[in-house]
From Swiss-Prot:
Entry function: MFS-type transporter; part of the gene cluster A that mediates the biosynthesis of the fungal meroterpenoid acetoxydehydroaustin.
Gene symbol of the encoding locus: ausY
Gene Ontology molecular function terms on file: transmembrane transporter activity
Record's miscellaneous remark: In A.calidoustus, the austinoid gene cluster lies on a contiguous DNA region, while clusters from E.nidulans and P.brasilianum are split in their respective genomes. Genetic rearrangements provoked variability among the clusters and E.nidulans produces the least number of austionoid derivatives with the end products austinol and dehydroaustinol, while P.brasilianum can produce until acetoxydehydroaustin, and A.calidoustus produces the highest number of identified derivatives.
Source species taxonomy: Eukaryota, Fungi, Dikarya, Ascomycota, Pezizomycotina
Origin superkingdom: Eukaryota
GO cellular component, one term: plasma membrane
Source organism of this protein record: Penicillium brasilianum
Basic and acidic residues: compositionally biased ranges: 1-10
Family: Belongs to the major facilitator superfamily. TCR/Tet family.
TM annotation in the entry: 85-105, 120-140, 150-170, 181-201, 208-228, 239-259, 284-304, 314-334, 355-375, 389-409, 418-438, 444-464, 478-498, 554-574
Protein topology in the membrane: Multi-pass membrane protein
Subcellular location: Membrane
Name this polypeptide is given: MFS-type transporter ausY
Keyword terms, alphabetized: Membrane, Transmembrane, Transmembrane helix, Transport
């Protein structure tokens, strides 16, 4: 190895793309991977200072901490054709995972009819969503220490196994167990897709593919109920799960044969034995985190709807969840850098800003994605399938705008301007949607949906890019997991808030406008049955009540979208083009 002279080094600027390494005569590095303060000095092996001004265009100390670590995609090049095949497989995987969240919406009645399981049907959805949310941070820890390719293939196999169990389920219990297994695999599969993209692609190309993966959520939200209804009516509901098998199989083959990542997250391998490796995964923290999240999500789902907020079941959830949460926080403070949720990451303004931004913007999307179809079904009197079609302006515009903005980020390098625009446009679109009334025409709901979709497209997928850009390579899995977890948590929390606003408004509105109509009966029947249950003479008044209740729920989306700006403001202006950390050395 040829090392540069001290005189030359002293005059050479150091930045995040050019990290200089001083070597001792025995070819051992004298400058280890350490944090170098901006404008500071480094010393050579003899102790004499080498006056080298650090000029980091991004002023991000995390990059400097691991200057000696190369990005995976620079270590193991992969051809463009293989990248295309792998990305196609990852898109299929994320689509399957997203589809499983929505496809049962129209198929559940057939399942309940076959298994005679009216009291258990809520678990067909909850078993999947609970495990999907509860294991996301745990997989972030696993991906930190073990190869992304291997972990991804294992979680994909789990998802496929869960889907197979669901499809072949002989009874309701087997279906619920299969859904839980699929949820565990799904969350690891989604996180692995994001990480594999960051590993096999140059980082300035990552935003486009991340946007494509994020678009699968929106597409699945529309396609899922249509497919579920078609399978249930014309084939069998079991195909709602069997459909995952061929698509997942293709993804497995593509990743297995074409991804050869050189980054094996070596820290776990440094441990001397299996016990040490296991302890590196923060098992105590994970064991406390999972019941914390399950208790929280169950409380949000059951509270006020299934059970009273003062029932003993909810009280048990409060106590157990609270105790586990306190224990988890204590373990994270104790373990620090080896924690599932390292405290130092939460002190990084790019991370807590991204968390706030993601939580608020994703929350607004969830509210409108859920309540817009209800508005179409109840106010316009259309079927569930027709309401999905009428929801297309929002989804299509969001996908197109997301891909367009990600392309611009690839060209310009900076994502921050789009994160500023997203809350402004999205809150405006949501605000206009909240002004809709019973007689609003198609030009109104199409235009307002499109405006809201533009706002979502500007920022929804770029939040993951923001976290990955701001972190050094070894922290990217944890940072990505935090954002993915925030997306799931936002869905649960904002659905709960909007549901309470909607239900309270319906109850108070019906008591005044149509006291003879049973709110409980309407809620149980669903929005598509509104015109069959309500007498013709009171229908106009009930429609006004429903319109008011739904648009009040839209207020939640307006407020959450507007609050997202407070997450965008703290973010540094970092360029994805500078996300490349290499040691500058010469080889003889």
């Amino acid at each position: 190895m040829i090392t540069e002279s001290r005189e030359h080094l002293a005059s050479k600027p150091l930045n995040s793309e050019s990290i200089i390494r001083l070597d001792t005569p025995d070819d051992k590095p004298s400058l280890e991977c350490e944090s170098i303060p901006s404008g500071g000095h480094i010393s050579d092996v003899s102790g004499g200072p080498v006056s080298t001004e650090v000029k980091d265009v991004n002023d991000v100390s995390e990059f400097e901490k691991c200057a000696m670590e190369e990005q995976t995609h620079d270590e193991v090049p992969i051809s463009a054709s293989k990248i295309t095949v792998v990305v196609a497989g990852l898109v299929l995987a994320v689509f399957c995972m997203s589809l499983d969240s929505t496809i049962l919406a129209t198929a559940i009645p057939k399942i309940v009819s076959q298994f005679h399981s009216q009291n258990e049907m809520g678990w067909y959805v909850s078993a999947y969503s609970l495990t999907l949310a509860s294991f996301s941070l745990a997989f972030g820890k696993i991906y930190t220490f073990y190869p992304a390719k291997i972990v991804f293939l294992i979680t994909l196999s789990l998802f496929e196994a869960g889907s197979l169990i669901c499809g072949a389920a002989p009874n309701s219990l087997a279906l619920i167990i299969g859904r839980a297994i699929a949820g565990i695999g799904g969350t690891g599969m989604y996180l692995g897709s994001l990480l594999l993209v960051a590993e096999i692609l140059p980082f300035d190309k990552v935003p486009i593919i991340t946007a494509l993966l994020a678009a699968m959520y929106g597409i699945a939200a529309v396609v899922g109920p249509l497919l579920g209804g078609a399978f249930a009516d014309y084939a069998t509901w079991r195909w709602c799960f069997y459909i995952n098998l061929p698509m997942g199989g293709l993804t497995f083959l593509f990743v297995f044969f074409f991804v050869k990542t050189g980054n094996d997250r070596k820290r776990a391998r440094e441990a001397n034995n299996i016990v040490s490796r296991f302890l590196e995964l923060d098992p105590i923290g994970v064991a406390l985190l999972i019941p914390t999240l399950i208790c929280l999500l169950l409380a949000l789902e059951w509270g006020g709807a299934t059970y009273s907020w003062h029932s003993w079941r909810l009280i048990v959830l409060y106590v157990v969840g609270g105790c586990c949460a306190l224990g988890f926080v204590g373990v994270q403070i104790w373990r620090q850098d080896t924690a599932t949720l390292p405290p130092r990451l939460l002190k990084n303004r790019n991370i807590w800003g991204t968390i706030l931004f993601t939580f608020c913007l994703n929350g607004s999307f969830v509210v409108l994605a859920y309540y817009l179809p209800i508005w179409f079904q109840s106010i316009k009197g259309v079927s569930a399938i027709q309401s999905g079609i009428m929801n297309l302006p929002l989804i299509l515009v969001m996908v197109i705008c997301s891909l367009l903005c990600s392309t611009l980020v690839t060209k310009l390098g900076y994502y921050t301007p789009f994160l500023y625009l997203a809350p402004i446009i999205a809150s405006t679109g949501a605000g206009l949607l909240s002004t809709m009334h019973v007689n609003s025409g198609s030009s109104v709901w199409i235009g307002f949906q499109a405006l809201f979709g533009i706002g979502l497209g500007c920022g929804l997928s770029l939040s993951i890019v923001a976290a990955q850009t701001a972190l050094p390579p070894q922290d990217i899995p944890t940072g990505t997991a935090i954002v993915a977890f925030t997306q799931t948590l936002a869905a649960a929390v904002f659905n709960f808030v909007a549901q309470n606003v909607f239900q309270n408004q319906v109850l108070s509105g019906l008591a005044q406008a149509a006291p003879g109509v049973s709110a409980a009966k309407l809620t149980k029947a669903g929005p598509t049955m509104l015109r069959e249950i309500v007498p013709a003479d009171t229908l106009p008044a009930v429609l006004e009540v429903y319109n008011t209740a739904i648009t009040r729920a839209f207020y939640v989306a307006v407020g959450s979208a507007a609050l997202a700006i407070f997450g965008a403001i703290p973010l540094q202006w970092l360029s994805v083009k500078n996300k490349k950390i290499q040691a500058v050395t010469a080889h003889a």
